UniProtKB/Swiss-Prot annotation:
Protein name: UvrABC system protein C
Domain UVR: 197-232
Pfam family, one: UVR
Subunit structure: Interacts with UvrB in an incision complex.
Keywords for this protein: Cytoplasm, DNA damage, DNA excision, DNA repair, Excision nuclease, SOS response
Location in the cell: Cytoplasm
Summary of the function given for this chain in its UniProt record: The UvrABC repair system catalyzes the recognition and processing of DNA lesions. UvrC both incises the 5' and 3' sides of the lesion. The N-terminal half is responsible for the 3' incision and the C-terminal half is responsible for the 5' incision.
Primary localisation category: cytoplasm
GO cellular component, one term: cytoplasm
Taxonomic path: Bacteria, Bacillati, Bacillota, Bacilli, Lactobacillales
């Protein structure tokens, strides 16, 4: 079952293509995936049943983040890059290579054009990877026909079959000029970088001619060839047309908050994304300029060869300081990348606002719902009390404080209650009177602020005792309500008003959830304090039974050793070091 945090983020997912990064409890990326529709895909992990590896993956996810792209193909390419960079544990299939083809122009005297699954630092040109394997293979065949290089083993003394077919420049029987290869490689690179308009126009005309001449099989082949080319060389913003290392900064501002995205492009790939959110004091352009300078002032952040920024940034000033060209993209692929980064900036900030809104409903909004149900003005502070004891022995009380719907643990208080013969047994009335008087008489004495509402864990007895002390002994008019549980010991309702009427809250409301959290928290705090006290009392009673151990010696032992086990393990010499006589020290050792 998804956590509340994940449920909130699932509700905010965009129905756009992109990549998602799943994180574990240590904020480590354990899985990277892509999706045509992030909303549907990511939700499926938490809204469907799974088995095997997927079930194990989902059980370890505590958070996720997304990066939106313009197309599904861009998401695919980014996914491969992120997997190769982060090596997530659950991406087993893609850990060794991508599993998808690249088109490669080899770095040889007589270069070849071929398909490969691995990218190596061998001086060759690589294009891809391509999600449509068959389309990539067909495009390779097309290129080998239109822009031939070497297609045989070479140097075999006679022309090969491909030379006769016009698909090899003839390295098989002659020395091919390097300029011939260079010219062909330029054409291939332009083609694979998306400059295919002339080729597509030519194929379209040939297809139309074939159809007019009723050569339908030929027309279908040309149609398929067009589709393969479009699938292979579709414009890709994730892959840039040069290998210049560059960083790209984009921002989005709303409601006084600035969202910044940083894209790191290396080896023609978007290899990393960073995001930052903070309040904006100056103009967003000034804030971004300052942020960029601070970013590269950190010792681990290396300057790239080029920095891309949105319009309105003082580029010359930044460039003079950083000694790096700083540019604003005006058209083409870089501008498209900037727009994609700006879109991510906007979505991140919108997610923050909506999560804050949801959190506000759960805290401040929930507290307001409780106050509304009781007919009280909205306040900030709720204090809740609960008692704990075993058949009246070692009675304690605990108080928890919630401010604007959030637990403030530094304001929690614990009370050891008076235990007398007159108060033997579970005397909830006396326990309530004592703790309420002690708490609020002290606040009055110290001149501190009073809460807006007091909640008593219990029924009519606790409620009336608290009201009586406040009104008749302390002269205070703090509203008091009783938290009532059902037969299953679950939060059920509130008791409030002169007639102690029952106030029901909608069990599905945030106010009811907050009331449950308060009741559970004060109960937990009281129980833990009582157990702690019982443990100390048990330890003290064992020491009291030892001859020669009085209150002072007992206090020394407890203060220095902390537990019965440590006292038992201590040597006679260690006990004597506390000022205990050797005889008493030996008696302690024998008794324990």
């Amino acid at each position: 079952m998804a956590s509340e945090h994940i449920e909130h983020k699932l509700a905010l997912l965009p129905a756009l293509p992109g990549c998602y990064l799943m994180k574990d409890i240590n904020a480590q990326i354990i899985y990277v995936g892509k999706a045509k529709n992030l909303k549907n895909r990511v939700r499926s992990y938490f809204k469907s049943s799974h088995e095997g590896k997927t079930a194990k993956l989902v059980s370890e996810i505590v958070d996720f983040e997304t990066i939106i792209t313009s197309t599904n193909k861009e998401a695919f390419l980014l996914e491969i890059t992120l997997i190769q960079k982060h090596q997530p544990y659950f991406n087993i299939k893609l850990k060794r290579g991508t599993g998808y083809p690249y088109i490669k122009i080899t770095n040889e005297r007589d270069p070849r054009l071929l398909i490969t699954g691995d990218v190596k630092k061998d001086g060759s040109y690589y294009f891809g990877p391509y999600p449509d394997v068959y389309a990539a293979q067909e495009t390779l065949r097309f290129l080998q026909r239109v822009y031939p290089l070497r297609r045989c083993q070479g140097h075999q003394g006679r022309p090969c079959l491909y030379y006769h077919m016009g698909q090899c420049l003839g390295a098989c029987f002659q020395e091919v000029p390097e300029a011939a290869y260079t010219e062909q490689i330029k054409k291939i690179k332009r083609f694979l970088n998306g400059q295919v308009d002339n080729v597509k126009k030519d194929l379209t005309e040939k297809m139309a001619t074939a159809a007019q001449e009723m050569q339908f099989e030929r027309a279908a082949e040309l149609r398929d060839q067009l589709r393969y080319i479009e699938a292979t060389v579709e414009k890709q913003k994730i892959i840039s047309n040069d290998h210049t290392p560059r960083d790209l900064f984009a921002f989005y501002m709303d409601k006084g908050w600035l969202s910044i995205q940083i894209f790191f492009i290396r080896q023609a790939r978007l290899i990393r994304r960073e995001k930052r959110l903070f309040p904006c004091v100056n103009t967003p352009e000034e804030e971004l300029a300052t942020f960029i300078l601070q970013w590269y002032n950190r010792k681990n952040n290396v300057l790239p060869r080029e920095i891309l920024v949105p319009d309105g940034i003082e580029k010359q000033v930044l460039s003079d300081i950083l000694q790096v060209p700083i540019r604003t993209p005006q058209r083409g692929e870089k501008k498209a990348l900037m727009e994609m980064a700006q879109k991510n900036s906007r979505l991140v900030l919108e997610e923050k606002f909506r999560l804050l809104e949801l959190d506000n409903r759960k805290t401040v909004g929930a507290q307001d719902e409780i106050m509304d149900a009781l007919g009280l003005p909205h306040g900030h502070v709720i204090e809740a009390f609960d008692h704990s004891h075993i058949q009246g022995t070692d009675p304690v009380s605990a108080m928890v404080t919630f401010v604007d719907g959030r637990a403030e643990k530094k304001l929690y208080r614990k009370y050891k209650l008076t235990q007398t013969a007159e108060r033997a047994g579970a005397n909830e009335d006396a326990n309530t009177r004592e703790v309420i008087y002690r708490r609020y008489s002290r606040l009055l004495k110290e001149g501190k602020a009073l809460p807006d509402l007091i909640l008593m864990d219990g029924g009519v007895v606790e409620l009336n005792a608290a009201k009586d002390v406040l009104e008749n002994e302390l002269g205070l008019t703090i509203p008091v309500a009783g938290m009532v549980k059902d037969n299953h010991h679950k939060t059920a309702s509130l008791l409030f008003g002169e007639a102690d009427q029952t106030i029901q809250l909608d069990p599905k409301s945030q106010g009811f959830y907050l009331l449950t959290r308060i009741q559970d928290e004060v109960h937990r705090f009281a129980i833990s304090f009582h157990r702690q006290l019982r443990g100390k009392n048990s330890l003290s009673s064992k020491l009291d039974d030892i001859k020669g151990v009085g209150p002072k010696t007992r206090t020394k032992l407890l203060k220095n050793f902390g537990s019965m086990k440590h006292i038992k393990d201590a040597s006679v010499e260690e006990l004597e070091a506390l000022g205990i006589s050797k005889t008493v020290a030996q008696t302690i050792k024998l008794s324990l």
